[in-house]
């Protein structure tokens, strides 16, 4: 580098330095002018403030004098003469005690200022702006008087325990961090979005469920019976899909099916899953009311994962989320996150748990990369939505919102936060609420937020309507039962003369219906009989007369146990006790319609053990306690005997309504014949044993038990591959499995592959022959399930034999 180049570089540096110095001089000049202007404003403010403080000092002086008079005896040894409350002192002793004041303001009286001669110097010398300090002190004062209100708004980003403890902070601690609280309060407002102006909003495809063919063939009666067997599912809302009973009916991917069957080992669906999953997958807003631990988490995670897969993935500039799960507590959020990760594994779907008390920086870093599912408490989600002026997260992609334990969300005071969150999400979102109860706050929220929701209630009440009072009477002989009925009806007619209190008497057969009608007519009581043996016109005529007659009495069979709606019916008498739970539920349901109250009275003979078992299961505790002691003890004995017989396999509970057409009649005839053989000591002829009961077609199974920690599971493996096709269908159809599950509590699962006759697996890698697994907590439950299943297998074998005969397979 020559001398000329060095000189040029030096001149450039010098010119640059002069330019920078000139800028600094201008800036310094401006800052000096600004400082002088600020000092002028400060002097004006101090002058005005001094005038205000002088007025306050007068009030304080009066207060301090009164306080000094009250404490004169106490202070007599401390001072020799009365000192003024304020101002200077003439003596040395006064100077020594000048720091003591007679009036000590409370800690929250932060707006009280005593200006001294050196105040102005301190204010000027202090590095902080005195005007800002004064404003902060005013904020402190406001925050002290409204501490609980501030904390109430701030605590939304903590869980319920933190917020409740925060509210108990005393006034002594109030001034701490009041500026921080004020700032936090002011920022927690999610930016509103006008979705009518949002461009390129993704169109949602929420209906992802197709009803299987086997469910489509079910009648309304079958669906009603299935819901009753699934812990008495109650539906409120229009066009609710039918409940499923198998995972395979949901159309899940092979990865999810493998996860459910092999890793999670979910053999069957819980009642809430049976009904809620198809409803949510259909794109409907759902309110699920079920007790905790009933499988609700899987009920909303499966549809959520499926909907996310059906949507376009997040773009590189999108942070998400697509699904939002709100919970009232951190612990529940963490628990849901653990389950969500299981379903997201290997699917490319990401999930994050955001709760108060966790590392916010790490959550922000993950959110910037984009997430599909956020599991959060309401407060922490609002924190994230308001960060970076609302640019960290965008709610425009949120299409699926879940509120788990929604009742607790509102009980813990998260209602305003939830409303704020829901208000910023797109209006065509799908919303799912799960709750153990359905309080009024939640009802109001659901009516405002959800669109045409389906409400699914699982076993929230008894099987019997709360408006119905159940009663029971036990008899030894039939004529005593009739005399009791006669007296009850006579007393009732006399008591309600001039009123309209109708009665329905249910009997077990058409013959008894006609007989009871004649006997009551002979005793001066007019009734209207209806049963399937009467012409249709006569049945309609008698039903119309019953409705038009005050205090009318209707005698009928099970033909009217469902569908009859006469609000004036206040008494139902079950003359022949119900043999099934479904029959009993629908029979007593003829009274207590709507908001009316009713009474259901069951007549039970001492040998009707199954009926006693049903009554004990259906009657409420207060109803059982109101039964006369003699009747209650006998009812309990009968129930205990039947329960013991269920465990040993001696007794079994009839399923459904008991009516199975001609097949059912054949079973009754066979049972009657066997009973006669037993009564007369006659041995059945071996030639009477049918082919289907021989060893060649007998249901084959192996039994065992499995130890799992402190519990034992009993199981049986049933070979159904070699059964006739009709028998195999009869044993494995949905209705059979659900009924047996209801009666025994056992779980069912089919495994293996079907092999035609004469064929089977060739090596160990091939699937075994088709078999059915039955598992239960008690050995007696498995025994009972095997017996019920064997009955169904025999039924199928009998149908197969009849079909072969009709087809001409066997001819002379």
Curated annotation (Swiss-Prot):
Instruction: List the EC numbers from the record.
Output: 3.6.4.13
Q: Which Pfam families match?
A: DEAD, Helicase_C, KH_12
Instruction: Supply the CDD domains for this chain.
Output: KH-I_PRP5_like, SF2_C_DEAD
Protein's recorded name = Pre-mRNA-processing ATP-dependent RNA helicase PRP5
Q: Where is the Helicase ATP-binding domain positioned along the sequence?
A: 277-456
Organism of derivation: Kluyveromyces lactis (strain ATCC 8585 / CBS 2359 / DSM 70799 / NBRC 1267 / NRRL Y-1140 / WM37) (Yeast)
**Which stretches does the entry tag as region Disordered?**
45-126, 153-173, 686-705
- Which reactions appear under catalytic activity for this entry? ATP + H2O = ADP + phosphate + H(+)
Per the record, where are the segments of Basic and acidic residues compositional bias? 45-72, 106-122
User: Which residue ranges does the UniProt annotation give for the motif Q motif?
Assistant: 245-274
Picking any one GO molecular function of the record gives: ATP binding
Per the record, the similarity remark reads: Belongs to the DEAD box helicase family. DDX46/PRP5 subfamily.
Q: Where is the composition biased (Basic residues)?
A: 73-84
- Binding-site list for ATP: 290-297
Locations listed in the record: Nucleus
Q: Where is this motif: DEAD box?
A: 404-407
Q: Does the keyword Nucleus apply?
A: yes
User: At the top level of its lineage, which domain of life is listed?
Assistant: Eukaryota
Q: Which GO terms describe its biological process?
A: mRNA processing; RNA splicing
């Amino acid at each position: 580098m020559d001398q000329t180049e060095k000189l040029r570089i030096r001149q450039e540096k010098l010119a640059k330095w002069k330019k920078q110095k000139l800028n600094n001089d201008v800036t310094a000049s401006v800052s000096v002018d600004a400082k002088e202007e600020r000092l002028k404003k400060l002097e004006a403010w101090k002058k005005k403030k001094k005038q205000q403080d002088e007025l306050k000092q007068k009030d304080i002086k009066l207060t301090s004098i009164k306080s000094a008079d009250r404490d004169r005896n106490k202070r007599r040894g401390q001072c020799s003469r009365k000192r003024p409350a304020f101002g200077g002192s003439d003596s040395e002793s006064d100077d020594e005690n000048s720091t003591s004041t007679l009036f000590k303001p409370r800690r929250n009286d932060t707006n009280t200022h005593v200006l001294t001669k050196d105040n102005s110097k301190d204010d000027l010398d202090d590095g902080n702006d005195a005007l800002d300090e004064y404003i902060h002190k005013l904020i402190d004062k406001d925050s002290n008087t409204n501490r609980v209100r501030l904390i109430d708004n701030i605590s939304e980003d903590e869980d319920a325990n933190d917020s409740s403890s925060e509210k108990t902070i005393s006034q002594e601690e109030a001034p701490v961090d009041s500026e921080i609280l004020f700032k936090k309060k002011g920022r927690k407002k999610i930016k509103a979005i006008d979705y009518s102006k949002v461009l390129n909003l993704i169109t949602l495809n929420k209906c992802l469920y197709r009803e299987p063919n086997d469910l489509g063939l079910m009648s309304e009666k079958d669906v009603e019976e299935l819901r009753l067997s699934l812990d008495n599912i109650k539906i409120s809302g229009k066009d609710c899909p039918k409940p499923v009973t198998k995972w395979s009916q949901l159309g899940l991917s092979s990865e999810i099916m493998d996860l459910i069957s092999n890793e999670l080992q979910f053999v069957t669906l819980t009642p809430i899953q049976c009904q809620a999953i198809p409803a949510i997958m259909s794109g409907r807003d759902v309110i699920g009311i079920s007790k905790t631990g009933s499988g609700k988490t899987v009920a909303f995670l499966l549809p959520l994962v499926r909907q996310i897969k059906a949507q376009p993935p997040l773009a590189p500039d999108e942070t998400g989320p697509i699904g939002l799960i709100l919970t009232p507590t951190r612990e529940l959020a963490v628990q849901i996150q653990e389950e969500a990760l299981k379903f997201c594994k290997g699917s490319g779907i990401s999930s994050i748990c955001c709760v108060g008390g966790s590392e916010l920086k790490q959550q922000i870093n993950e959110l910037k990369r984009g997430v599909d599912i956020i599991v959060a408490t309401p407060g922490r989600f609002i924190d994230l939505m308001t960060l970076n002026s609302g640019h960290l997260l965008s709610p425009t992609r949120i299409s699926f919102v879940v509120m788990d334990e929604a009742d607790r969300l509102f009980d813990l005071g998260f209602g305003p936060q939830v409303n704020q969150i829901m208000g910023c999400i797109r209006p065509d979102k799908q919303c799912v609420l799960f709750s153990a109860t359905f309080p009024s706050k939640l009802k109001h929220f659901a009516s405002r937020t959800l669109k045409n929701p389906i409400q699914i209630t699982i076993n929230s009440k008894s099987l019997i309507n709360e408006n119905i009072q159940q009663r029971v009477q036990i008899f030894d002989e039939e004529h005593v039962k009739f005399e009791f009925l006669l007296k009850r009806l006579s007393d009732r007619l006399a008591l309600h003369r001039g009123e309209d209190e109708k009665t329905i008497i249910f009997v077990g057969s058409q013959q008894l219906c006609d007989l009871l009608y004649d006997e009551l007519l002979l005793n001066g009581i007019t009734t209207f009989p209806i049963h399937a043996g009467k012409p249709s016109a006569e049945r309609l005529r008698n039903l119309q007369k019953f409705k038009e007659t005050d205090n009318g009495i209707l005698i009928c069979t099970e033909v009217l146990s469902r569908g009859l709606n006469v609000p004036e019916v206040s008494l139902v008498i079950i003359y022949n006790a119900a043999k099934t739970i479904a029959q009993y539920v629908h029979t007593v349901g003829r009274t207590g319609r709507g908001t009316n109250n009713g009474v259901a009275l069951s007549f039970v003979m001492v040998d009707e053990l199954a009926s006693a078992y049903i009554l004990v299961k259906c009657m409420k505790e207060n109803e059982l306690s109101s039964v006369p002691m003699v009747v209650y003890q006998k009812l309990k004995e009968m129930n205990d005997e039947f329960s013991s017989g269920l465990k040993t396999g001696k007794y079994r509970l009839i399923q459904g309504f008991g009516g199975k057409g001609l097949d059912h009649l054949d079973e009754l005839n066979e049972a009657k014949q066997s009973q006669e053989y037993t009564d007369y000591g006659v041995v059945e002829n071996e030639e009477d044993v049918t082919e289907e009961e021989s060893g060649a077609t007998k249901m084959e199974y192996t039994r065992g038990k499995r130890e799992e920690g402190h519990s034992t599971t009993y199981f049986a493996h049933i070979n159904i591959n070699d059964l006739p096709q009709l028998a195999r269908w009869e044993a494995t159809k949905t209705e059979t499995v659900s009924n047996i599950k209801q009666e025994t509590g056992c779980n069912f699962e089919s495994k293996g592959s079907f092999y035609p006759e004469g064929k089977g697996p060739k090596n160990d890698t091939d699937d075994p022959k088709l078999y059915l697994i039955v598992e239960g907590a008690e050995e007696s439950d498995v025994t009972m399930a095997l017996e019920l299943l064997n009955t169904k297998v025999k039924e199928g074998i009998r149908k197969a034999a009849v079909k072969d005969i009709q087809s001409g397979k066997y001819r002379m």
